[in-house]
Each structure stands twice: as structure tokens, then as C-alpha cells.
From Swiss-Prot:
Note: Regulated at the level of mRNA maturation by RH42. The RVE2 pre-mRNA can be alternatively spliced, generating a poison cassette exon that harbors an very early in-frame premature termination codon. The resulting severely truncated mRNA is not efficiently translated.
Function per UniProt: Positive regulator for cold-responsive gene expression and cold tolerance. Part of a regulatory feedback loop that controls a subset of the circadian outputs and modulates the central oscillator. Negatively self-regulates its own expression.
Example GO BP: regulation of DNA-templated transcription
PANTHER family to which the protein is assigned, alphabetical: PROTEIN REVEILLE 2 (PTHR12802:SF175), SWI/SNF COMPLEX-RELATED (PTHR12802)
Molecular-function GO term, any one: DNA-binding transcription factor activity
Natural source organism: Arabidopsis thaliana
Descriptive protein name: Protein REVEILLE 2
Mutant phenotype after disruption: No effect on the regulation of core clock associated genes or on the hypocotyl length, but hypersensitivity to freezing stress and slightly earlier-flowering phenotype. Rve1 and rve2 double mutant has no alteration in the period or phase of the clock. Rve1, rve2 and rve7 triple mutant has no alteration in the period or phase of the clock.
Gene Ontology cellular component annotations, sorted alphabetically: nucleus
Subcellular location: Nucleus
Domain HTH myb-type: 31-85
Length: 287
């Protein structure tokens, strides 16, 4: 019995919920406060006259009508044009719908980047007096390149031929200073080394390389040997020319490396190094 009562109560609850689901809700009552805009016959006649005079210039039509805004005139024109197109051939009145206004084309449709030239290019353009020639369509009016080129041409054209040599010297000095600034400096073990450009070093004259070789070859070979802890004697060898593959070049490199060794060294190790230097000198007699 208890089970039957529970089943009946559940069935009755389901029926009540289903009836609530199908129950239609009433719409919330509201009042229309803003009425539809009405056009009088006089306003419509003024509107048609303005259409014939000004076309789709809504601001001028607004001034001509006087009582309606441009937004209201535009919405009224859309309704009027649909009505004229619908009643075409039925009504005797022939009203020409003005064509839509052409869209304005932008002056620069895509953003353009300002190209900043390098310092070397600017110096070269000023020296030669030639500027980069580009099409007017591909160049913006506020271009940095055109401005620099015009300045360089104007300065060269205005100056006299007597002052051309002074200008060239000043420009060369500026270019040299710019190249010196571009060189990189490297600091290793408390010493600064200037790292130059590989291409510029390869493009040097052969005469300079020859001078450097002669200078390095003519340097004297100096060997230092200490006979006591306080006194040191230097042996200066006479100058001579040698080839790069000779044994004397290896001797010089080994001796200079040993002489340039700095820092603390134990006494026994130092004695061995000095003995090695003496042996090297004896094995390669210098004449």
C-alpha cells in the first residue's frame, strides 16, 4: 500500500510539472513613448527639389529642408527610392534616382616604412653628388632618402669649385672617423685588442704588407740569461734576413715565448728554462 501511494504521488507531481511547462506566459505590458516620424507634404516637396538640385548630398538637403536632420533625410530617401523602384511604370510621375556617390580613394592605402640610410651611404652620396633615383609612385613624399639626396645636391651645387677640395678633405676625415668607430675592441687578460674588418684588411696594398714583413724580419733577436739572482745580461745578435720556413724563425718564437712568460715561477723550473735557452742558442749558432 505504501508503495502504491508513493507511485501515485510521483505521477501527480509529474503531471503538475508538465502542465506548468505548457503554460503560456503573458507578455509584459509596455507603452510606445516615441511615435514614428511623419513627413508633411511641404517637407516632402522640399526633399524632392533638393534631390534634383544636390543629388545625394545629405547635408545640403538638410539645409534646404530645414526641419529634418541628415539621418532622417537619408532614411526617408531610402524608403522613397524603394517606393519609386516598385511603382516604376505604374505611376505617371518620372523621378530620377541620383546615382550613388563614388567612394574616396585613400592617398596612401598601405603604411610605408621610413628607410634610414647608413652613414657610409650618406657620405658616398654627398661626395659623388648622386642620389638614389626612384619612381614617384614607389616613394613617399616624406622620404628620408629623398631629403638627404636633395640636401647633398643643393650643397654641392651652391658651393664654388675653389672650396671643393676642402669639402672633399672634410668628407674623407668624417668617413675615416666613422670607420674607426665601427671597429670593435676586444679585452683579454687586461689588454685591449682592436679587431678590424677582414675584407678591409685583405684589400690593403701589397706594399704595406712588404714593409711589415721587412720590419718583422729585420728585428734583432734578443736572448736574456740570468747568471745570478740580481744581475741579468742581454745578448744582442746581429741583424740578418731569413725565410719564413727557416729554423731561426722557430728559435725566435720559442725564445720570445719564454721571455714573455710572466708571473711567479719556482726556482728549479726557472733554472731549467734558462738551461733550455742556453742549449737552443748553442745548437743554432748565429753568425
Amino acid at each position: 500500500m505504501a508503495m502504491q501511494e508513493r507511485c501515485e504521488s510521483l505521477c501527480s507531481d509529474e503531471l503538475i510539472s508538465s502542465s506548468d511547462a505548457f503554460y503560456l506566459k503573458t507578455r509584459k505590458p509596455y507603452t510606445i513613448t516615441k511615435q514614428r516620424e511623419k513627413w508633411t507634404e511641404a517637407e516632402h516637396e522640399k526633399f524632392v527639389e533638393a534631390l534634383k538640385l544636390y543629388g545625394r548630398a545629405w547635408r545640403r538637403i538638410e539645409e534646404h529642408v530645414g526641419t529634418k536632420t541628415a539621418v532622417q533625410i537619408r532614411s526617408h530617401a531610402q524608403k522613397f527610392f524603394t517606393k519609386v523602384a516598385r511603382d516604376f511604370g505604374v505611376s505617371s510621375e518620372s523621378i530620377e534616382i541620383p546615382p550613388p556617390r563614388p567612394k574616396r580613394k585613400p592617398m596612401h592605402p598601405y603604411p610605408r616604412k621610413l628607410v634610414i640610410p647608413d652613414a657610409k651611404e650618406m657620405v658616398y652620396a654627398e661626395l659623388t653628388g648622386s642620389k638614389l633615383i626612384q619612381d614617384e609612385d614607389n616613394r613617399s613624399p616624406t622620404s628620408v632618402l629623398s631629403a638627404h639626396g636633395s640636401d647633398g645636391l643643393g650643397s654641392i651645387g651652391s658651393n664654388s669649385p675653389n672650396s671643393s677640395s676642402a669639402e672633399l678633405s672634410s668628407h674623407t676625415e668624417e668617413s675615416l672617423s666613422l670607420e674607426a668607430e665601427t671597429k670593435q675592441s676586444l679585452k683579454l687578460f687586461g689588454k685591449t685588442f682592436v679587431v678590424g674588418d677582414y675584407n678591409s684588411s685583405m684589400s690593403c696594398d701589397d706594399s704595406e704588407d712588404g714593409k711589415k714583413k721587412l720590419y718583422s724580419e729585420t728585428q734583432s733577436l734578443q736572448c736574456s740569461s740570468s747568471t745570478s739572482e740580481n744581475a741579468e745580461t742581454e745578448v744582442v745578435v746581429s741583424e740578418f734576413k731569413r725565410s719564413e720556413r727557416s729554423a731561426f724563425s722557430q728559435l725566435k718564437s720559442s725564445v720570445t715565448e719564454m721571455n714573455n712568460m710572466r708571473g711567479f715561477m719556482p726556482y728549479k723550473k726557472r733554472v731549467k728554462v734558462e738551461e733550455n735557452i742556453d742549449n737552443v742558442k748553442l745548437s743554432y749558432p748565429l753568425w
